[in-house]
Amino acid sequence: MKRQSERDSSPSGRGSSSSAKRPREREREAEAGGRRAAHKASGGTKHPVPARARDKPRGSGGGGGHRDGRAAGDANHRASGGRSSGAPGGGGRTGKASGDPGAGGASPRASPLPPPPPPPGAEPAGPGSTAAPEYKTLLISSLSPALPAEHLEDRLFHQFKRFGEISLRLSHTPELGRVAYVNFRHPQDAREARQHALARQLLLYDRPLKVEPVYLRGGGSSRRSSSSSAAASTPPPGPPAPADPLGYLPLHGGYQYKQRSLSPVAAPPLREPRARHAAAAFALDAAAAAAVGLSRERALDYYGLYDDRGRPYGYQAVCEEDLMPEDDQRATRNLFIGNLDHSVSEVELRRAFEKYGIIEEVVIKRPARGQGGAYAFLKFQNLDMAHRAKVAMSGRVIGRNPIKIGYGKANPTTRLWVGGLGPNTSLAALAREFDRFGSIRTIDHVKGDSFAYIQYESLDAAQAACAKMRGFPLGGPDRRLRVDFAKAEETRYPQQYQPSPLPVHYELLTDGYTRHRNLDADLRVRDRTPPHLLYSDRDRTFLEGDWTSLSKSSDRRNSLEGYSRSVRSRSGERWGGDGDRSIAKPWEERRKRRSLSSDRGRTTHSPYEERSRTKGGGQQSERGSDRTPERSRKENHSSEGTKESGSNSLSNSRHGAEERSHHHHHHEAPDSSHGKKTRESERNHRTTEAEPKTLEEPKHETKKLKTLSEYAQTLQLGWNGLLVLKNSCFPTSMHILEGDQGVISGLLKDHPSGSKLTQLKIAQRLRLDQPKLDEVTRRIKQGSPNGYAVLLAIQSTPSGPGAEGMPVVEPGLQRRLLRNLVSYLKQKQAAGVISLPVGGSKGRDNTGMLYAFPPCDFSQQYLQSALRTLGKLEEEHMVIVIVRDTA
């Protein structure tokens, strides 16, 4: 009764009286709504306004005044929600029940927003977009599952590295099977590589490959951060969109995990629930994405999309420390490799890491059992190679353990490697930016290269430049410098690619060919990997073909044409005309047979003399007509004991030519009428004999020096004896590289007896720090030219020079090889020091110091001649510096 009286006294009594019939009316209206929906589907045109008009007072009665307060602001949302959520057979009532919170008595909530429009300037992804979206990653599929991973990586790396800096990773997906991700540094490089792959069918081991770009979603971090809060208000999904082969490819779990690491933890939703705030929300999303950490995002774009093959479960590939080299002040070309297996070898480490660059040094440390795992230090040629290896190999399993990789200590020198240069960077720009730190000695840079070497006069200037210029923008807004120390006397190219010395059968390339940008980059990365045996000739021709852009390919063709022209010109100078060039190979074979036959005592005709006669033409025939019977008899006498159809050997030809020359001199005075013709004939004969001498010179060399021991035998022996360290002695031979012999004989002798010293005991060590090395250099300059000597110390052999004077090893000393002493000094990073003379001296008239340096940057400056002769120094050696004290 009370409720009935309240209903009677309410202003809307009629409307509220009808609310008692609400359950039955709902059933009838639901049935009527179903009939209306069916009628509408069959072509009816009944207007749905009365249904919405009846819903409005019912909503106000159920929701109260709060619903009325929001009715004006949310009318558009309710109308759009009712239309979008209505389904056939359910009518508008079903849409109202599912979209209107007031029907259930709960607090009202705004209906979900449609997806906001893209921000101004954003590029839509997909094939239907007007502007092509950018991508840095290519997905390579249809790979053969039977090929080894290393060979597959090498072949793909060789195909795509010519387009720019890349990193490559193999993976496996359930849909595509074996795939590879090729990540480029710049989007234009990736686009150029894909265009070439589409222009011509890419084959690998007779198998066509499929190349597709991988687009990264714009603003992905903000969408992911707000996905949890908007999950409840997401509208029902529409029909599935057609497959987009060029859209964003869903990758495996490891990649999604890395993408999630870019978003801030527990980030609040940034979008306002109003359509009019969509543009502002996108601006906030962009600001939030920029604040997440651009260095990590750039590292992910450059080296991302790596699979988890070979990594332990749960390993996070992209962590806080994976900064780009220009952002990481700790980045050096030295890598620390931890958690290694005790049985790991240097060959295994080189095989695993050499694909990322040139490794100069590998040092493996194996602590005792129970004191930790083994670890190693790898020194790459430059910082780019080291960073590429660090990112790609972190967490990979070598042996049985997943390795840990970090940067090692830097080795400061006066020479800097500067990377990250743009193609238009000039020497003047480098000099202008780096000259402010100190005096520059040299700048080694070829226009178009992405790196340069800068040599300073002092170590302090190099250290200041390395610290201040790392990350400096030079060459454009998107390029920043990478700076690291390099070898003090390092040449521009690695030793294995030095143009000299070359074997006899190699040809030197022209300057335009060797300094071409793309070919230069090929030399720097990893052209040392041999092609696989399954790699057919047709594939090799395709891979070594022209895969660059039109401008680059034209440059390469020009350089190749210049190179071929130079080779043809050299060949023409060497072999004469085309007819001579066609018989060059038989001459080579006959020359080899001639060298063998001369050793056996048989003489054959010299092809070079025959060629000179043929090459001379008419002059040669005149020379033949001038031959007197007396000269013919002398020639026949010089070739006595041979067959008539045979010919003279090279030595006999020279001997005959000398006799003929002597014969001309003998008859020149009495026969003055023929003097001019005789002198001309003599010049021709001298030309004839000079050519075989020139071509025969390599044969008369003793032999090509191949080892450091052979090179040392060409030097003067300075001292031979035993170097003693603690309880070990090392037989050593010292050969003079430069300096005064008197310093050696004056300081390396026993003063009481006056005899030569046979033992030198190392009692001190000198740390290989730059200030101490500068002090040694200063003492050498003060003692020049007669106050110092530099010697090359190698292992003394029983059959070597001075071996007969080797002293007998004293009791208690263990004879060991010199390489053990070198390894000890390398490990200590020090040089051995001996005060001279041994035993001390009463005065300072004849005193000095001996420094024994292991192979290091300081010692290499005295072995440049050996490096030019041998190419590389593989034997263990030391450089001995003896300096006499100055008053």
From Swiss-Prot:
Q: Where is the RRM domain?
A: 136-216, 333-410, 414-488
Give the location in the cell: Nucleus, Nucleoplasm; Nucleus speckle; Nucleus envelope
Compositionally skewed regions (Low complexity) per UniProt = 10-20, 95-110, 123-132, 222-233
User: Could you name the Gene Ontology cellular component terms for this entry?
Assistant: nuclear envelope; nuclear speck; RNA N6-methyladenosine methyltransferase complex
Quote the InterPro entries the UniProt record gives: Nucleotide-bd_a/b_plait_sf (IPR012677), RBD_domain_sf (IPR035979), RBM15B_RRM1 (IPR034475), RBM15B_RRM2 (IPR034535), RBM15B_RRM3 (IPR034536), RRM_dom (IPR000504), SPOC-like_C_dom_sf (IPR016194), SPOC_C (IPR012921)
Q: Which residues form the SPOC domain?
A: 708-886
Q: Where can the motif Nuclear localization signal be found?
A: 590-594
**Region of interest (Disordered), ranges:** 1-132, 215-249, 549-703
Comp. bias regions, Basic and acidic residues: 22-34, 65-77, 570-613, 623-643, 668-700
Skewed-composition ranges (Gly residues): 83-94
Q: Where are the stretches annotated Interaction with Epstein-Barr virus BMLF1?
A: 719-887
Chief localization: nucleus
| Residue list for modification Phosphothreonine | 529
Q: Which domain of life is it from?
A: Eukaryota
The family note in this entry says: Belongs to the RRM Spen family.
PANTHER family, per the entry: RNA RECOGNITION MOTIF-CONTAINING
Q: Write out the function statement from the record.
A: RNA-binding protein that acts as a key regulator of N6-methyladenosine (m6A) methylation of RNAs, thereby regulating different processes, such as alternative splicing of mRNAs and X chromosome inactivation mediated by Xist RNA. Associated component of the WMM complex, a complex that mediates N6-methyladenosine (m6A) methylation of RNAs, a modification that plays a role in the efficiency of mRNA splicing and RNA processing. Plays a key role in m6A methylation, possibly by binding target RNAs and recruiting the WMM complex.
Report what the protein is called.
Answer: Putative RNA-binding protein 15B
